[in-house]
Amino acid sequence: MTSSYSSSSCPLGCTMAPGARNVSVSPIDIGCQPGAEANIAPMCLLANVAHANRVRVGSTPLGRPSLCLPPTCHTACPLPGTCHIPGNIGICGAYGENTLNGHEKETMQFLNDRLANYLEKVRQLEQENAELEATLLERSKCHESTVCPDYQSYFHTIEELQQKILCSKAENARLIVQIDNAKLAADDFRIKLESERSLRQLVEADKCGTQKLLDDATLAKADLEAQQESLKEEQLSLKSNHEQEVKILRSQLGEKLRIELDIEPTIDLNRVLGEMRAQYEAMLETNRQDVEQWFQAQSEGISLQDMSCSEELQCCQSEILELRCTVNALEVERQAQHTLKDCLQNSLCEAEDRFGTELAQMQSLISNVEEQLSEIRADLERQNQEYQVLLDVKTRLENEIATYRNLLESEDCKLPCNPCSTSPSCVTAPCAPRPSCGPCTTCGPTCGASTTGSRF
């Protein structure tokens, strides 16, 4: 905002005379928002106190004074910063009462017009400020609705997916534990299978040994049967031979009996042969019974061993089948668990990639929102600074209005004398000259050419 005070020369149609004074107010520029008026039209307050000149206040002409005014008894005092208000207003013997009232009215009208323009400008600036605040509020709401969407649903989805991931991790850990347990059980079953296999090999070796014993016993039985047959044949041959010998002996003894009877008594050969036959038959029966008992004992032992071995073999075979079924089931379950583990790992990797991409997008969106927020903050700070500048302008203008009001009140207080009616006090004690109170030290024709400016 720029405000400058300067004293300018009279406009066309106004000539300066000795003792004339100019009061001019330069344009007051108020910097505002784009689209607002940048400048207020310049207004000049000109008052020329001369006998033959016209006086203008702003652009309003005042008529010539109708009275012949004597020279003033005071030196005109310009106000600080400008050559304000006509120099002879409020000075003893300057004008008549009607002329002073006309100047006061014109000055008040000018100041009222300027105050009205200022108030209109302030109202316009306040209205524009309210419009800008409403626009900023709408833009902030629009940014909040478009740039800052509601992420609560995404947060709920992320929490649900995190819970699912945790559940999947727990399930994966449980499956890993089950797989480890299954591996340990499979190792135990493998060890048991190896032990059963070694036991089976031992049983098969025992079976082979028992089979060999059985074969040997069968061979021994066959040998014994062959020996029995040979003994039977030998017995038959011995019987036949014995009968033949008996016949021969009987035939021989028949002839010798007579001789022996004649000589001495003979031995009973039938009894001896019967005893020998009985002894041989007892020996054969004993040997046969012993061989049969040994054979039966061996056969029973071998059959018992064979039965026990067959039962153990069946038990081992059934256990082997059960173990094979268990191993196959565990292998199938292990393959299924491996497949499930691979699927879960793939789904976990996909979920991590997807959520990583979404997280990157959200981070980029958050960074964009932060940038927009920083821009909005910068705009708010800039507008706040502009608002502070406008408040400063308003304060300075209010101070200026107060200064004008004080000047008017002070000028009103300085008008006690009437040039047409001479009071005794003015005759006896004329007004003393006043000291200079402003930057201007002389008031004459050169006062209209001096210029003083200030910017704030």
Swiss-Prot record:
One of its GO terms (cellular component) is extracellular exosome. The keyword Coiled coil applies. Residues 104-415 form the IF rod domain. It comes from the Eukaryota. Keywords: Coiled coil, Intermediate filament, Keratin. The keyword Coiled coil applies. Gene3D superfamilies: 1.20.5.170, Single helix bin (1.20.5.500), Vasodilator-stimulated phosphoprotein (1.20.5.1160). Residues 1-104 are annotated as: Head. Residues 268-411 are annotated as: Coil 2. The record marks D353 as: Stutter. GO terms for biological process: epithelial cell differentiation; intermediate filament organization. Belongs to the intermediate filament family. This is Keratin, type I cuticular Ha8. It comes from Homo sapiens (Human). The lineage of its organism: Eukaryota, Metazoa, Chordata, Craniata, Vertebrata. The gene is KRT38.
